[in-house]
Amino acid sequence: MPPKTRSTARRSGRRVVKKNVAQGHAYIKSTFNNTIVSITDPSGAVIAWASSGHVGFKGSRKSTPFAAQLAAENAARKAMDHGMKKVDVFVKGPGSGRETAIRSLQAAGLEVTSISDVTPQPFNGCRPPKRRRV
C-alpha cells in the first residue's frame, strides 16, 4: 500500500470580499461595560466592526470614552478600505462612549450625514436592577 501523502493545509473561514460601497450605516451600541461599532452597507450587511474589547481593552477600561474612540477609528478605517465615504449614525444605549465614537468617526474621514438615537425605551417593561450600595 503506498504511503499517504498529505495535502496542503486549507484555511477555514470566510474569504474577505472587498465591496465598493460609498454610503452606509454606522451602529454604535454603547453600554455601561463596552462599546460596539458596526458599519454596514445600506441593505444591512456588516462591512466592518470593532469593539472596545476587540481593540485590546479589558475589564473596566472597556467602558471608557477613549476605548470607544479607538474602536470607532478602527471600524472606520476598515470601512474606508471598502470604499465607504458617508455614513448615517444610529446610537443605542446609555454608555459613556457615545459622543466620542461619533466624533472619532468624523475625525477618521467618514462624512456623517445624520445622527439618530435609537435607544429602546420601555413602556414600563422589565424591573430594573437594584440600586448599587458602594
From Swiss-Prot:
Endpoints of the signal sequence: none
Family annotation (Gene3D superfamilies): Ribosomal protein S11 (3.30.420.80)
SUPFAM superfamilies per the UniProt record, alphabetical: Translational machinery components
Keyword Zinc tagged: no
Subunit structure: Part of the 30S ribosomal subunit. Interacts with proteins S7 and S18. Binds to IF-3.
PANTHER family: 40S RIBOSOMAL PROTEIN S14/30S RIBOSOMAL PROTEIN S11
Protein name in UniProt: Small ribosomal subunit protein uS11
